[in-house]
Amino acid sequence: MDVNPTLLFLKVPAQNAISTTFPYTGDPPYSHGTGTGYTMDTVNRTHQYSEKGRWTTNTETGAPQLNPIDGPLPEDNEPSGYAQTDCVLEAMAFLEESHPGIFENSCLETMEVVQQTRVDKLTQGRQTYDWTLNRNQPAATALANTIEVFRSNGLTANESGRLIDFLKDVMESMDKEEMEITTHFQRKRRVRDNMTKKMVTQRTIGKKKQRLNKRSYLIRALTLNTMTKDAERGKLKRRAIATPGMQIRGFVYFVETLARSICEKLEQSGLPVGGNEKKAKLANVVRKMMTNSQDTELSFTITGDNTKWNENQNPRMFLAMITYITRNQPEWFRNVLSIAPIMFSNKMARLGKGYMFESKSMKLRTQIPAEMLASIDLKYFNDSTRKKIEKIRPLLIDGTASLSPGMMMGMFNMLSTVLGVSILNLGQKRYTKTTYWWDGLQSSDDFALIVNAPNHEGIQAGVDRFYRTCKLLGINMSKKKSYINRTGTFEFTSFFYRYGFVANFSMELPSFGVSGINESADMSIGVTVIKNNMINNDLGPATAQMALQLFIKDYRYTYRCHRGDTQIQTRRSFEIKKLWEQTRSKAGLLVSDGGPNLYNIRNLHIPEVCLKWELMDEDYQGRLCNPLNPFVSHKEIESVNNAVMMPAHGPAKNMEYDAVATTHSWIPKRNRSILNTSQRGILEDEQMYQKCCNLFEKFFPSSSYRRPVGISSMVEAMVSRARIDARIDFESGRIKKEEFAEIMKICSTIEELRRQK
């Protein structure tokens, strides 16, 4: 039977059908190949928006830099980055006037954070540019490498373990005439295999010392590595995102802490809150505008879009903002906060892997690394690429492009939100001094603007004034992509408002289904997603029940664990049937062991093991939850685990789910192929860290200890702890005299070895 899809919508109010137009089903698009082209686009575009600025040359690195600040006022509607310092400062002053004490209080809060933050804050985060190896690494490894290099170059303030002291080392490192680093490299050689007598390539990993002069080190310290942003839906073209190195990260963290503290106190800020809290905040602003627009007044809302927000922002403006916000604060604090924008004014963008060429006739492929783009003959490239390279050449130094204007994606979300809110704040009648007034919401580059006025001319005048004010601060509202409606219908950060927020359910679609972590976690996450959507996203009981049945079906197909009494044949069905027949209480079997599903929409909050515990056979309980079972790598499982959910837009969300450690909570082993690459040295380092930490936690099982800092104290702490524990055990008769003597001997040997080293 053919169903006419329009029939589905006969009973649905139009605004609820919005979610069906979102591109969120199916797999999102991923990028392949290099991001070099996208990065060059970003660099060239950013310079084009600021082209009427002043060119200077960085005295330390020799990089050409473009400064658009206080540049010509725009005469057309083209996007531009010519922010006016005095306007930004005035906007800040008015923001403070409407919120007395806001900057002062946020500075005090931030100062406290600065003094308490430990350096391991920087281990959070995924890929980070590792300047010692000149490529991306997991954050923890990149930090460890940086600290190792700092220490071998005589920079030791970081040993206190405070982030602020690590940053002192960063500052000192920039004054050094040279830095010595250790790099990993591969040697390949052809050798004959004794068994097969064939020639094989043997790879060995070496480490070599390398000296960087001041200029090379500064370039690396100021480099942002670039990648292509993956899994972006609803876009035809990919775009580049940046990941900064460890030198910049700590400074950015403190600036964002200050800005976050300010945003929390601003009613128009959509950050740092999210979810229902954000919806409540937004609804408040709308309510205020609707109740204050008397019967005589019109109220309109713009669903706003800004053109290339990041590329028109400027770190120099952020420096001006910070200088103003911290004006009455101690010198050291002002200095710490001003370093991030200064580093960003001198940043370099690494162009990525370069280009891949292939010759169809000769079956050859060759990689042109980014470093060669400055000198290579352009006849090999197509027109568009040739234009890009020609444009970017004057900016190139060692495979990186000088990029002074613009902020790369996602670096100063909070601070740029403060800038946006400062314009919304200017819409109060006491500032507009006329009949129109405005208010709105700002979340990074996304905004909604509500304008009230006695008539349509007033609304138009208000929008125009807002538009021009934005231009003065380097913000470009897109006239093509923004649209205006009577207040009551608008969209903001993918929340659709229609006399209240409409659930945009399609955005949650990607999180339904089996996550693929392991049988235990997947069951738990699957039901938690359904539960959360019933709470937050208007998922009704009937639909939820259906979602649950589909999930169980999906789960059984994924793990081939169909019920023990089913006819479906899979690789596991022989084992599962055997278990089914031996089990007295079949309802007690987990779904992943071929048991029935006992979940319904009322008990989604209970972990499956708990739900079925009373129904299980005793020997099944014993096997399922046996910590001595050799097949389980039991991590110490906390009662609440975190899964990283990728919602359809915005950052990955942490989702909590209940976890019960069973034989189904396995952790897959690492892929072997990494062991043959130059990453192997890094992997060994990581395992060494892991082993040391595990050993340390064996000695100090309580989680209440403060981590000791510096390598010496760890060993000493473990030795002294071993001696104390051994004495207690010996005196209470838990160990024999010989064992006690042996432990003491081992402790002395360890200390002796440390002294010799």
Swiss-Prot record:
Keywords: Eukaryotic host gene expression shutoff by virus, Eukaryotic host transcription shutoff by virus, Host cytoplasm, Host gene expression shutoff by virus, Host nucleus, Host-virus interaction, Inhibition of host RNA polymerase II by virus, Nucleotide-binding, Nucleotidyltransferase, Phosphoprotein, RNA-directed RNA polymerase, Transferase, Viral RNA replication, Viral transcription
EC code: 2.7.7.48
Post-translational modification: Phosphorylated by host PRKCA.
Segments for region (Disordered): 53-82
Subunit-level organization: Influenza RNA polymerase is composed of three subunits: PB1, PB2 and PA. Interacts (via N-terminus) with PA (via C-terminus). Interacts (via C-terminus) with PB2 (via N-terminus); this interaction is essential for transcription initiation. Interacts (via C-terminus) with human PKP2 (via N-terminus); the interaction competitively inhibits the interaction between the RNA polymerase subunits PB1 and PB2.
Role: RNA-dependent RNA polymerase which is responsible for replication and transcription of virus RNA segments. The transcription of viral mRNAs occurs by a unique mechanism called cap-snatching. 5' methylated caps of cellular mRNAs are cleaved after 10-13 nucleotides by PA. In turn, these short capped RNAs are used as primers by PB1 for transcription of viral mRNAs. During virus replication, PB1 initiates RNA synthesis and copy vRNA into complementary RNA (cRNA) which in turn serves as a template for the production of more vRNAs.
Protein name: RNA-directed RNA polymerase catalytic subunit
Source species of the chain: Influenza A virus (strain A/Brevig Mission/1/1918 H1N1) (Influenza A virus (strain A/South Carolina/1/1918 H1N1))
Lineage of the organism: Viruses, Riboviria, Orthornavirae, Negarnaviricota, Polyploviricotina
